[in-house]
């Protein structure tokens, strides 16, 4: 039972860090943002590429550990 508070604190810290990183990631150069009148279109091209590369590297590293 003493491990549960530690897990909750670590999970909270991880979520806080992820939230801070994602706040800045969505505004990268290369992301498409078009606003005309009432219509707003946002497509995070560069953000998607960076997330894909990072996830590919992490999954590749975790796959090799087995």
UniProtKB/Swiss-Prot annotation:
PANTHER family documented for this protein: BSR5223 PROTEIN
Transmembrane intervals: 6-26, 39-59
Coiled coil: none
Membrane topology: Multi-pass membrane protein
Alphabetical list of InterPro entries matching this protein: DUF2905 (IPR021320)
Keyword entries, A-Z: Cell membrane, Membrane, Transmembrane, Transmembrane helix
Subcellular location: Cell membrane
Protein name from the UniProt record: Uncharacterized membrane protein YrzS
Entry GO CC: plasma membrane
Principal subcellular localisation of the protein: membrane
Protein's gene: yrzS
Family annotation (Pfam families): DUF2905
Species annotation: Bacillus subtilis (strain 168)
